[in-house]
């Protein structure tokens, strides 16, 4: 019995000891840095004092409500799982203010530390722009090698009047000058060091923050990989990008409101060196897989002369299987940008009202990239709005119009008043872009457009759509969108709409429309609204079969995309095919190459190349491979097959392999 009591007492004392380590520190203008900071009466006075303490898991650092604290907060120490270190306020509802004045860098810098949460703070600089100086409100930074940072919550903060350099080169300018910045910093030399261990950042939540009057960006999350969420943030008057997220796997960007972004980037008189990045957008992603942008609102982007962007949304380089859905775009300089080298991205059930200039700009391959826009609504009542197939800056090297674009299904294009649409191919720089709306690709009918509704004028005619519905879709009240997703009920269909049941079924469609109505199997409606009562009962077996077929076709398309467009050489003994992604286990087939010297064909079995990114193909001795030689690739997953050729440039290939 005594033993049990002794053990219980020991456990209790251990618990009390652990709890005692979790301290709450107070900071007040009336405090004293010589105090212990552990009560309001013994509060610290300055940020400088806070920066000298190494904090422990579960600690809290509370600044006095409504008070102003000068300087840059750079705390030390890390929290732990379930015990983050928190920066917040005490003593009232007003936010404490961190004012870091003319200093370069961040108002709050969390560098090479983990498990931190910043809540309910106000961060500002108010200092005027200074050439070469970049600034951030809150920065999470992994600098140097082999730091594995984790768990950052930046929530309910007000960040404003932070003026950094819009471009240039340096650790704090350009994209690194923003209200909230999450980044991994490494120097150029590290990319040439094979022993270098890159740092990582995971578990980032940026939520409920208000951001106003900032240059360059609102929120930048660059390099964080897993569990990245950017949600319910509001921003207005941003010089460059609103939200830019680079690098996550299955990230989530939702319920954000972005007003007047892209306001100063690309201005011809903007001071700075030649390292500007003038092309900016409101909400965009890059180098990311299966990331979702949804329920966001973007209004009134700017577009200065050297900014070729100004889009509300953007799938940028190396976006793979990402989705933009249930978003709203109003009076922006473009709805969506599709860069090249992006694959199987989806834009669905979005509404664009009175966007300007380029509605959608496409820079990638129609066949290889396989991006799709379906069940969106595009409304315009003034100005010319382009589906812009951008072929490049120079006419001499312009992209082939037969391999440029995206797939458009079940969309409504609605032009009224002084508005009209145009399909055009463009070349040239932003400030002197040339459009040709007479070009038409030589593609089978329906290769790009299928089952869309067209109402109102199209300069040079509507696209080639074998199932085009040229009719009034009969919206309830088109053009009446205001502020908020709830203002868009006017884009619901009337019961007599010809769009009801006229669409093409799309598998894996998210199972809901813009307004939350279920989207099931059967005759899908055209547009962002699925009219209840127009669809027969769902057939689960048929729907599952359609989804399975789509996934199977997708795996072959994905394998094809993994192959490059040109075969490179690799020394004297072989040439190589460098894959973008490893080939998955379900893909079978072969790679073959015919020696132009002796006509002999060499073959490699795909099954021997699993989990390999580089395929080395041996060649005959002293062979000159003429321009136009092809490497043939055949792929199958048992249900779907693909055959294609990859050209080899003119190179000298020498070895002894026969």
Spell out what each predicted region is.
Residues 84, 88-93, 114-125, 147-163, ...:
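Right-handed parallel beta-helix
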Residues 621-627:
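Surface-exposed, short loops/turns at beta-strand junctions within beta-sandwich domains
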């Amino acid at each position: 019995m005594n033993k049990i009591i002794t053990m219980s007492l020991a456990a209790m004392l251990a618990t009390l000891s652990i709890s005692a380590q979790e301290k709450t520190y107070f900071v007040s203008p009336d405090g004293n840095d010589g105090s212990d900071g552990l009560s309001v009466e013994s509060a610290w006075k300055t940020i400088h004092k806070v920066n000298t303490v190494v904090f422990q898991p579960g600690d809290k650092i509370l600044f006095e409500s409504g008070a102003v604290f000068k300087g840059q907060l750079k705390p030390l120490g890390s929290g732990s799982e379930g015990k983050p270190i928190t920066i917040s306020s005490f003593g009232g509802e007003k936010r404490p203010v961190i004012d870091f004045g003319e200093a370069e860098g961040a108002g709050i810098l969390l560098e090479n530390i983990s498990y931190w949460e910043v809540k309910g703070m106000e961060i500002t600089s108010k200092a005027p722009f200074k050439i070469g100086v970049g600034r951030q409100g809150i920065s999470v930074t992994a600098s140097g090698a082999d730091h594995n940072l984790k768990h950052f919550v930046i929530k309910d903060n007000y960040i404003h009047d932070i003026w950094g350099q819009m471009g240039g080169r340096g650790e704090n300018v350009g994209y690194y000058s923003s209200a909230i910045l999450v980044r991994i910093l490494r120097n150029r030399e590290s990319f040439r060091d094979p022993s270098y261990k890159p740092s990582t950042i995971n578990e980032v939540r940026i939520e409920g923050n208000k951001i106003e009057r900032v240059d360059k960006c609102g929120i930048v999350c660059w390099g964080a990989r897993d569990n990245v969420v950017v949600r319910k943030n509001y921003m207005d008057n941003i010089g460059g990008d609103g939200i830019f997220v680079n690098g996550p796997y299955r990230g989530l960007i939702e319920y954000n409101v972005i007003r007047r972004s892209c306001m100063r980037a690309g201005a011809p008189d903007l001071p700075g060196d030649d390292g500007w990045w003038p092309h900016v957008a409101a909400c965009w992603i890059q180098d990311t897989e299966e990331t979702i942008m949804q329920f966001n609102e973007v209004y009134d982007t700017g577009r200065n002369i050297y900014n070729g962007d100004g889009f509300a949304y953007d799938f940028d380089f190396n976006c793979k299987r990402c989705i933009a859905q249930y978003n709203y775009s109003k009076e922006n300089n473009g709805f969506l940008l599709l860069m090249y080298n992006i694959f199987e991205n989806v834009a669905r059930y979005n509404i664009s009202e009175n966007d300007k200039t380029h509605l959608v700009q496409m820079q990638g391959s129609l066949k290889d990239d396989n991006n799709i826009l379906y069940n969106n609504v595009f409304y315009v009542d003034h100005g010319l709005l382009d589906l812009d197939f951008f072929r490049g800056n120079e006419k001499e090297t312009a992209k082939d119009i037969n391999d440029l674009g995206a797939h458009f299904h079940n969309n409504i294009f609605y032009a009224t008043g002084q508005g009209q649409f145009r399909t055009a191919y463009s070349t040239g720089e932003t400030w002197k872009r040339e459009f040709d709306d007479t070009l038409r690709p030589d593609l089978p009918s329906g290769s790009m457009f299928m089952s869309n509704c067209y109402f109102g004028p199209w300069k040079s005619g509507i696209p080639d759509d074998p199932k085009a519905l040229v009719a009034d879709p009969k919206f309830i009240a088109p053009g009446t969108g205001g502020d908020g997703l709830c203002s868009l009920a006017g884009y619901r269909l009337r019961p007599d709409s010809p769009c009801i049941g006229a669409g093409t079924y799309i598998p894996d469609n998210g199972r809901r429309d813009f307004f939350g109505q279920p989207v099931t199997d059967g005759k899908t409606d055209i547009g962002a609204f699925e009219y209840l009562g127009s669809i027969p009962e769902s057939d689960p077996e048929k729907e599952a079969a359609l989804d399975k077929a789509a996934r199977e076709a997708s795996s072959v398309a994905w394998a094809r995309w993994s192959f490059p467009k040109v075969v490179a050489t690799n020394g004297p003994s072989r040439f190589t095919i460098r894959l973008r992604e490893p080939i998955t286990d379900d893909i079978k087939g072969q790679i073959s190459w015919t020696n132009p010297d002796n006509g002999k064909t060499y073959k490699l079995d795909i099954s021997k190349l699993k989990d390999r990114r580089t395929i080395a193909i041996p060649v005959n001795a002293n062979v000159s491979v003429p321009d136009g030689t092809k490497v043939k690739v055949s792929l199958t997953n048992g249900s779907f097959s693909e055959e294609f050729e990859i050209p080899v440039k003119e190179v000298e290939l020498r070895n002894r392999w026969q």
